[in-house]
């Protein structure tokens, strides 16, 4: 499998942008039934800009995993779309705090680890950790459904709920705002050996 982290305009294949929006539409609109902005089979919103950073995973069938990274020094989803998930906390507005959104995987396209979590999830967060270390990011935040929160805990990611820590209504699901601690616990959680092979997409050579 090929792994990419960065801006879409830096990806070696220009087609990946529409592939990403189609993949997101299949996951968030078709499979989960979320109320998202979808047009002609593409799910895209105002946070998708040329400067948005991504982690992407693809195999011979196409994209099978993604996550979006947004700096909290700029407009981001938690205070704009899901303010109740802040649970009474003030929204971070710092360049060393980033938000994770649009996490999606096709779990059937990779092995599962001993804890039952798909390798794709672990690889995505391994790349997120590397990105955060390189950028001097000290903390990550996200809004997640309760099932996704449980997956993160099974993986061993060091997370805590924001504010009053109670689940809130996110529309189609109930969920929480969470904070990730970027410490040695995070590094251990994503440091498991993998059965699959994951190479850097930037090293992809086209004939």
From Swiss-Prot:
Keyword Transferase: yes
Gene3D superfamilies found in the cross-reference section: 3.40.630.30
Function: Required for the synthesis of N-butanoyl-L-homoserine lactone (BHL), an autoinducer molecule which binds to AsaR.
A UniProt-annotated Pfam family: Autoind_synth
Family note: Belongs to the autoinducer synthase family.
Name this polypeptide is given: Acyl-homoserine-lactone synthase
Nucleotide-binding as UniProt keyword: no
Any single GO BP term: quorum sensing
């Amino acid at each position: 499998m090929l792994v990419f982290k960065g801006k879409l305009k830096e990806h070696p294949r220009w087609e990946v942008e529409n592939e990403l929006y189609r993949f997101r539409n299949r996951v968030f609109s078709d499979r989960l039934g979320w109320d998202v902005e979808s047009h002609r089979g593409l799910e895209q919103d105002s946070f998708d800009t040329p400067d948005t950073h991504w982690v992407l995973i693809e195999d011979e069938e196409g994209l099978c995993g993604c996550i979006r990274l947004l700096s909290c020094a700029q407009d981001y989803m938690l205070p704009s779309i899901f303010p109740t998930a802040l649970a009474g906390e003030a929204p971070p507005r710092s360049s060393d705090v980033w938000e994770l959104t649009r996490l999606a995987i096709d779990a059937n396209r990779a092995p599962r680890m001993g804890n039952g979590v798909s390798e794709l999830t672990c690889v995505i967060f391994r790349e997120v950790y590397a990105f955060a270390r390189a950028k001097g990011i000290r903390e990550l935040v996200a809004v997640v459904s309760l099932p996704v929160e449980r997956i993160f805990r099974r993986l061993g990611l060091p997370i805590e709920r924001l504010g009053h820590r109670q689940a809130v209504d996110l529309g189609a699901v109930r969920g929480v705002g969470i904070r990730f601690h970027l410490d040695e616990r995070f590094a251990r959680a994503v440091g498991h050996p993998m059965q699959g092979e994951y190479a850097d997409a930037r090293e992809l050579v086209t004939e």
